[in-house]
Amino acid sequence: MLALLLGSCESTYYDAMEQIGIHKRDILIDRIVDAQEAQQDGQVQFKNALEQFRSVVNFDGGELETIYDRLNGEYEDSVSAAEEIRDRIDAVESVADALFDEWTTKLGQYWSANLRRESERQLKNTKSRYTRLLTAMRRAERSIEPVLATCMTTSCT
């Protein structure tokens, strides 16, 4: 039931955006850029967390609680970055699904068989490129979990 409700909300959103001249393909492009930026930000965050961890490995005394708080903060920021990446990729997937559904529906509206075949070819090529992009994004997302798990088990929290 919730999926049906959320799907209709997204459909309403896309319809409203199209009314003001912003098409699903434009939303898709924006969401891909947002996801890529989130991945880059996440990469920076993980690098910062690693640097903080390395500084503790060479720890020679001092305020243990301060160091723990700093490491825990880096870990929490890394978890947030991972969630942001996941959310951005999910948003890309959502608008892409809506775009491809609309495109498929419109194929049945062509009067010309040649134009329909050309649009089907473009749809197939676009889906193929999108699938490669989404696969790469999901692979990058999956690579984050082992880093977080390692950080969690090696005194980052």
Segments (PLM) and residue ranges:
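Early exported N-terminus immediately downstream of N-terminal targeting peptides
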Residues: 25, 29-107
